[in-house]
Amino acid sequence: MKKLFFALFAFVTFFSTGAFAADSQKLPLPTAIKDSLPWFAVRELKDDNTPFTRGHLARLTQKYDRVAMVYFATWCIPCRAGIKQVVAQQAEIEKAGTAIVLVNVGERETTKVRDFLAKLSADKMVSITDPYGRLTEGFGLVKEGQNISLPRTIIVNKSLKVLQLIGEEGDDYIKILMGQ
């Protein structure tokens, strides 16, 4: 009986310590963003009347080496986990030269989205909203009328060239955001 208990304990310990830790899912770049991000215009979440364009993103790259556009929705459980990781490591991510822009996709109730971000302590981060999916369609992440598979993160350099497209965040997600 002791051997069975020990074997069960060892089995549970082995699998719960990250021995099989998953890496982030790296995805191929859609044709629309292989060279550079196309022009776009969406709205900032803090104020529905404030535009956020490719020019605003370019200004962020004057201060940072990279910008990570972290796509999310309030109903997406893996997105919640990814945002929590980013919030917990935000200072280190920014110190490593990466700015974070949270991109809400497909939701029109901005109050609900703001409340969601406040609960995650992410309400001070730059957050934009793409309620009609124009940004995701323009970037080739989905075809017109389709829903985006979340989570997604696009990392761009100073010239707005896409460095990586990430699907599900893994144990290496923060290191990827930091350019490591």
Spans of features found by a protein language model:
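N-proximal helix/coil linker or "cap" segments that precede and/or mark the start of modular domains
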Residues: 18-48
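Aromatic-flanked redox-active Cys/Sec active sites in thiol-based oxidoreductases
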Residues: 70-76
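Structural microenvironment flanking redox-active thiols in thiol-disulfide oxidoreductases
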Residues: 80-121, 134-138
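A short beta-strand-turn-helix
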Residues: 41-67
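Short, internal strand/loop/helix patches
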Residues: 117-150
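Positively charged n-region of N-terminal signal peptides that target proteins for export
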Residues: 1-4
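Thiol-/selenol-based redox modules, centered on thioredoxin-like
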Residues: 149-180
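Bacterial N-terminal signal peptides
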Residues: 7-16
